[in-house]
């Protein structure tokens, strides 16, 4: 069963590229035609590239890898946060901090600081022994850390792959991933450089519907990979991994919504399985 249909791609406006004067000649092979000064992307190619990216993400997660979702432009922020959270993956949908990958040891220390401040707040000691001014500064520090690092707060190591919406805007993230040899999976609009992406998906990276659809497809691949990982561990008799934040992995627990949705897509009734 196809992970996405041509009809869905058309409805999402995935085929609309940029104006013909704003393009990267390297994208010529992915362009079907031109209409009213706008390049039209070849969705037949998009379908095959989606399948390739889907399989890569699924296999990466099945082997224990993590996928970092990145998209800080307004059109991508909600989809990135929602879909990454749905499958327990880290995400960045605010400003990308330079060194988030290449200097992760320092970023990790900031994550520990965020958790420290959260613990102080929970214990009621964030304001307890501090002056009003000090308490205000600590509160602002916590809010800033939450805003910039909240999506990766549970990330303890570098991701096995990154999903990126708009490689031109997120060029620093792309550069850092390439420098570290982390595979880049991304939407390729007609103004992008395909040489920078390992698993490209030719498509519209500006329209909310297009971005939401393609990000959902990648999240579905993650979900299927997580299910394969859990099944493999159960077969091997190995202990279950640490739970994904906010998600229980115990065999006796009810299926999460994304698991039920995935089974439904495959024509399986979760209730008949007794889960």
UniProtKB/Swiss-Prot annotation:
Pfam families xrefs: Ribosomal_S2
GO biological process: translation
Record CDD domains: RPS2 (cd01425)
UniProt-annotated stretches for the region Disordered: 232-256
Domain of life: Bacteria
Gene Ontology MF: a single term: structural constituent of ribosome
Keywords assigned by UniProt, alphabetized: Ribonucleoprotein, Ribosomal protein
Ribonucleoprotein found in the keyword field: yes
Presence of keyword rRNA-binding: no
Any one GO cellular component localisation term in the record: cytosolic small ribosomal subunit
InterPro entries: Ribosomal_uS2 (IPR001865), Ribosomal_uS2_bac/mit/plastid (IPR005706), Ribosomal_uS2_flav_dom_sf (IPR023591)
UniProt signal peptide: none
Record family assignment: Belongs to the universal ribosomal protein uS2 family.
HAMAP family: Ribosomal_uS2_B
Record-given protein name: Small ribosomal subunit protein uS2
Native source organism of the sequence: Acidothermus cellulolyticus (strain ATCC 43068 / DSM 8971 / 11B)
């Amino acid at each position: 069963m196809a992970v996405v249909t041509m009809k869905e791609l058309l409805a999402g406006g995935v085929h609309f590229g940029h104006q013909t004067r704003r393009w990267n000649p390297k994208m010529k092979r992915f362009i079907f035609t031109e209409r009213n000064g706008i390049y039209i992307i070849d969705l037949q190619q998009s379908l095959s590239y989606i399948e390739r990216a889907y399989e890569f993400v699924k296999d990466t997660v099945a082997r224990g890898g993590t996928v970092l979702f990145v998209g800080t432009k307004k059109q991508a922020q909600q989809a990135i946060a929602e879909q990454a959270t749905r499958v327990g993956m880290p995400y960045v949908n605010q400003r990308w901090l330079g060194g988030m990958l290449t200097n992760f040891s320092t970023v990790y220390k900031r994550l520990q600081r965020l958790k420290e401040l959260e613990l102080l707040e929970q214990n009621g000691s964030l304001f307890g022994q501090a002056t009003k001014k000090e308490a205000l500064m600590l509160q602002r520090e916590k809010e800033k850390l939450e805003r910039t690092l909240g999506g990766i707060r549970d990330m303890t190591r570098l991701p096995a792959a990154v999903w990126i919406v708009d490689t031109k805007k997120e060029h620093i993230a792309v550069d850092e991933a390439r420098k570290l040899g982390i595979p880049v999976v991304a939407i390729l609009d007609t103004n992008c450089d395909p040489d920078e992406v390992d698993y490209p998906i030719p498509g519209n990276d500006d329209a909310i519907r297009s971005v939401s659809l393609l990000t959902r497809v990648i999240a579905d691949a993650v979900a299927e990979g997580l299910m394969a990982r859990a099944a493999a561990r159960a077969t091997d008799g190995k202990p279950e991994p640490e739970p994904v934040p906010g998600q229980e992995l115990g065999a006796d627990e009810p299926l999460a919504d994304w698991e039920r949705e995935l089974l439904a897509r495959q024509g399986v009734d979760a209730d008949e399985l007794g889960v």
